[in-house]
Amino acid sequence: VIGLTGPDKADIKYPTEAQLLEDFIKAQQLPVKPYEETVSNEPLIPELPAPGKIREMKTDPLFGATVLTLDNGIKVVLKHTDFKKDEILMTATSPGGSTLFGAKDIDNLKVFNDVITLGGAGNFSATDLNKVLAGKKVSCSPSIGLNTENVNGYAAPADLKTLFELVYLYFTAPRMDEEAYTSFENRMIAQLKNLELNPMVAFSDTLTKAIYDNNPRAARITAGDFKQISYPRIMEMYK
């Protein structure tokens, strides 16, 4: 069975049944090599940095948490819970956020959180990173809010070291991948063009403009915004 689906638009020309069948037969005749899975044995961080030191340790009597101050000024709050014994949750935050950037970066900020990890980290593409992390219970995602910069993650106790390595890589070695970004942009533009055919979207846009006094920071992303979005600029903002 061959199926073809797409939006019902006058400017889109779909292949005929005969053309689909012809392409299907051609594809069957092409030589296809068996897929070979390649997984790198390279460590996430080839050379570990010099370890830091704990400058101060104290107890928060209100929450029963341990508060550490590291020699780089970062404060770490450790709180033991018994909600889930095989999971460690981590949230890191610092003042900052999207409001620190001017009007020229508003469109870049609309896709900022989606784009910054597209290229992977360190020596690993996003695809290779997923392969290396297969079988591990670990996740790490940097992001930006209105007035904060954040890194959220979780790990099983056995994979906590991997979580810290990912945090380090996203801080020190974010990776660009132009091909991955182009694929993301093309998908988003196609999705947004179809979305904008829905009259309820136009209604929602008008409502948002009225509520937020036409503030461009509150507007949703549109297909046209990608003309102003710059992948290199986003990665520069991230760093």
Indicate residue ranges for each PLM-predicted region:
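Short secondary-structure boundary/capping elements
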Residues: 60, 226-233
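Short structured motifs
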Residues: 64, 76, 136-137, 233-235
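M16 family metallopeptidases and their MPP-like homologs
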Residues: 1-6, 77-79, 84-173, 185-193, ...
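Non-catalytic, conformational "gating/processing" segments within enzyme and secreted inhibitor domains
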Residues: 205, 231-239
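Proteolytic maturation boundary segments
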Residues: 1-103
